[in-house]
């Protein structure tokens, strides 16, 4: 938004907890209030996702459906970007994107640029404070918002972001093996797609 370029921010609720959606809308309003180049939209994707679930009823899988929420949002972002001759801007940070790979492949990982991907999560929080982002946004427990039970990132990962950052940077960390275990599981997201090399 600070670039002065036209910026479109979207809230795309899919079976969303009301508290999560309220925070999304509050941040959208804050951006519109502070930057005249920002426009915000709420695109309700519930009915579309329900239709998707119904179509794939014989192939139900909770984890797969959770990731499908992120992929539906990614598809929506690219459609809105295409309609505006724009690009999709990512929100992933260093520990998520390059440390433990805590994102959905072809979901929230599907972006054109990633301006804060070299910042740790704790640095993103500090940056948010510096910019005057709403306190309730900064202090909200991080969550991917993909699960009906509203589980947090820490609940899924088993470590806080501060612990993950420390383990990422310190080979002697007591959490290093846990960090490495999560990283190994998700490494396929962070590496190039395997290609079968055909001999000449």
What spans do the regions from the language model cover?
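ATP/NTP-dependent adenylation/nucleotidyl-transfer catalytic domains that generate, transfer
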Residues: 5-8, 15-16, 27, 31, ...
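Conserved Walker A/P-loop ATP-binding site and its immediately adjacent core
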Residues: 20
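Conserved SAM-binding loop
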Residues: 24
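A generic local structural motif
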Residues: 74-76
């Amino acid at each position: 938004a600070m670039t002065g370029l036209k910026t479109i921010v979207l809230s795309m609720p899919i079976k969303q907890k009301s508290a999560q959606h309220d925070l999304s809308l509050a941040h959208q309003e804050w951006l519109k209030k502070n930057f005249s180049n920002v426009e915000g939209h709420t695109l309700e994707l519930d009915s579309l996702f329900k239709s998707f679930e119904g179509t794939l009823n014989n192939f139900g899988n909770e984890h797969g459906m959770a990731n499908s929420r992120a992929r539906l949002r990614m598809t929506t972002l690219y459609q809105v970007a295409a309609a505006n001759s724009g690009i999709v801007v990512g929100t992933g940070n260093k520990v998520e994107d390059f440390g433990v790979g805590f994102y959905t492949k072809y979901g929230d990982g599907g972006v054109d640029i990633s301006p804060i991907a070299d910042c740790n999560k704790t640095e993103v929080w500090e940056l948010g404070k510096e910019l005057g982002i709403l306190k309730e946004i900064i202090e909200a427990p991080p969550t991917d918002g993909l699960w009906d039970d509203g589980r947090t990132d820490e609940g899924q990962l088993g470590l806080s972001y501060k612990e993950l950052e420390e383990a990422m940077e310190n080979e002697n960390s007591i959490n290093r093996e846990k960090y490495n275990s999560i990283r190994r599981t998700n490494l396929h997201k962070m590496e190039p797609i395997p290609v079968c090399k055909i001999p000449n």
